[in-house]
From Swiss-Prot:
PANTHER family to which the protein is assigned, alphabetical: PROTEIN NCBP2AS2
Miscellaneous: Induced by hypoxia in cancer-associated fibroblasts and promotes tumor angiogenesis by causing increased secretion of VEGFA which leads to endothelial sprouting.
Transmembrane portions of the chain: none
Annotated gene: NCBP2AS2
Protein name stated in the entry: Protein NCBP2AS2
GO cellular component: mitochondrion
Length: 99
């Protein structure tokens, strides 16, 4: 509790904040933070641009991609169901089913 108050008092001191901001480790940490934020922003803009280009492309290619995804998904689902032993879930009727 005392340590918390001491740190709060020190961090609210303009002279200490000024001296810390001039120190090499704090400046380096600020540079790295700014670099990381800028890189994240640029990557986000690039991803948004690629999505816009994809959406603005021919509708036929988007439909083909959706069909390929649907076909691959149904194939994997069927393969997975074939690999299971026993009745499919929900096929039993009556009390005590699927216990």
């Amino acid at each position: 509790m005392v340590l918390r108050r001491l740190l709060a008092a020190l961090l609210h001191s303009p002279q200490l904040v000024e001296r810390l901001s001039e120190s090499r480790p704090i400046r380096r940490a600020a540079q790295l933070t700014a670099f990381a934020l800028l890189q994240a922003q640029l990557r986000g803009q690039d991803a948004a641009r690629r999505l816009q280009d994809l959406a603005a492309g021919p509708v036929g290619s988007l439909c083909r991609r959706a069909e390929r995804f649907r076909d691959a998904f149904t194939q994997e689902l069927r393969r997975g169901l074939r690999g299971r032993s026993g009745p499919p879930p929900g096929s039993q009727r009556g009390p005590g089913a699927n216990i």
